[in-house]
Design a protein with these regions (language model features):
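Metal-dependent de-N-acetylase/amidase catalytic core
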Residues: 1-13, 93-241
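Active-site rim/loop-helix segments in enzyme catalytic domains that contact anionic ligands
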Residues: 1-109, 230
Length: 241
């Protein structure tokens, strides 16, 4: 299929503040290039993203604010609107209160296309973020779910993003992001608090992970760099391109 994002309102719904750069920043940049409006929503605050050896007491105060600032700075480079779910790391789940928050975000932003985590990604917050995005994409159109904003006229299309490290994900299609790798790197560079964790034994160096994934998906697609997706084929969340 030939993608043209002109006129679209694309919203990436991710679990953590640095997930966009790893999985879909190049596609959002492609959208902006085509004339789309793009947005980024992180459901979790990133409050537990601290270096090994540091106690919660040492860094818990202010971590959320730091990561919110990093997320906002990265979005500014892209020209994206930002939204925050405000949930603590590890506490994300598909429950009514969290659904209502994302439904409200959908109704304020009014996306035509949502990029969401794959339902089998490695992190529990990623899987919960998918469940919330999938549910909100439907209930945001229902007048029975009252949030104070007007319901959407129709559900947005829903694309599933690649999994981190490409585990157990069969791409349905690829987006060529070769020209946007420098922007992905610049955006990732905004997340200084996480880049400082590169030496942690339990934390993958983010830039290496991001570049390796873009390169491998690019090789599969016959281009320098790519991001992989799959269309979520459920009723009214599918449309022709």
């Amino acid at each position: 299929m030939k993608l043209d994002f002109a006129g679209e309102r694309v919203l990436a719904v991710v679990a953590h503040p640095d997930d966009v750069e790893l999985l879909c920043a190049g596609t959002l940049a492609r959208g902006r290039e085509d004339g789309a409006t793009v947005g980024m929503c992180t459901m979790c605050r990133g409050n537990r993203g601290m270096a090994a050896g540091e106690s919660a007491n040492e860094r818990s105060f202010g971590v959320s604010e730091v990561r919110q600032g990093e997320f906002t700075a990265a979005a500014k480079l892209l020209g994206a609107e930002v939204f925050f779910g405000g949930i603590g790391d590890g506490e994300l789940e598909d429950i009514p209160k969290q659904r209502r928050e994302l439904i409200s975000i959908f109704r304020r932003y009014r996306p035509t296309l949502v990029l969401a985590h794959a339902p089998n990604d490695y992190h529990a917050d990623h899987r919960a973020a998918f469940e919330l995005a999938e549910a909100a994409s439907w209930f945001a159109c229902s007048a029975g779910h009252v949030t104070g904003e007007e319901p959407l006229e129709r559900p947005p299309a829903l694309w599933l993003m690649d999994t981190v490290e490409m585990h157990d994900f069969s791409p349905g299609f690829y987006v060529d992001v070769s020209e946007h790798v420098p922007l992905k790197r610049d955006m990732l560079g905004c997340h200084k608090s996480q880049l400082e964790r590169a030496g942690d034994s339990d934390f993958a160096p983010l830039e290496q992970l991001m570049l390796r994934q873009a390169q491998v998906r690019g090789e599969q697609a016959g281009t320098e760099a790519a991001e992989a997706f799959r269309i979520h084929t459920v009723w009214k969340r599918v449309r022709a391109w």
